[in-house]
Amino acid sequence: MENEGKNNMNGMEMEKGKRESRSRKGVELTMRVLALVLTMAAATVLGVAKQTKVVSIKLIPALPPLDITTTAKASYLSAFVYNISANAIACGYTAISIAILMISRGRRSKKLLMAVLLGDLVMVALLFSGTGAASAIGLMGLQGNKHVMWNKVCGVFGKFCHRAAPSLPLTFLAAVVFMFLVVLDAIKLP
C-alpha cells in the first residue's frame, strides 16, 4: 500500500517534469525562431540599404563646383559587410539548429546539447562583435571625426543612414536572444 502511494507520486512528478520539459522546449523553439527572424531582418535591412546622390565638390575656389554622382552602400564598408556576414551566419546556424533539435525531439544526447550550447555561445560573440563594428562606423558616419578631418557622411547620405540604422538594434536583440538561449542550454545540461 505504501509503495503504491510512492509509485503514484513518482508518476505525477514524472508527468510534471515532462510538462516542464515540453514548455521549456517550446520556449527554446520560440526564442530560436525569434533569433532567426531578427538575424534575417538585420542582414536584409543593412544589405539593401543604398542611396545615390549628386554631390558638389569644389576643387579650386576660382572654378565652379564639380557635380559627381556618388552611391553609399553597406558593401563599401568592411564593418557593415562584417555585420551582414555575422547576421547571415547566425541566421543559417539558427535554421540548422532548429532543424536538428526538431529531428532529435526526445533523444537529445549530452553531446548534442553541448554542441548547441557552444554554437549559441559563438553566435553571441559573433553578433556582439558585428554590432560593435557596425556601430563604430555608423557613429563615425553620423558624427564624423574632427581630429582626423573626417566629415559627417550622414549629412550627405541621410536616407542611407536611416535605412541602415535599424539593423544595429536588430542585431543587438538577436545577440541578447542567443544569450538567453545559452542560459536555457546550460540549464538543460545535467
From Swiss-Prot:
Entry GO terms, CC: plasma membrane
Biased composition (Low complexity): 1-12
Region (Disordered): 1-24
Topological region Cytoplasmic: 1-28, 105-111, 185-190
Domain of life: Eukaryota
Compartments (UniProt record): Cell membrane
Record topological domains on the Extracellular side: 50-83, 133-163
Biased composition (Basic and acidic residues): 13-24
Keywords on record: Cell membrane, Membrane, Transmembrane, Transmembrane helix
The family this protein is said to belong to: Belongs to the Casparian strip membrane proteins (CASP) family.
PANTHER family according to UniProt: CASP-LIKE PROTEIN 1U1 (PTHR36488:SF8)
UniProt subunit comment: Homodimer and heterodimers.
Protein name per UniProt: CASP-like protein 1E2
Native organism: Arabidopsis lyrata subsp. lyrata
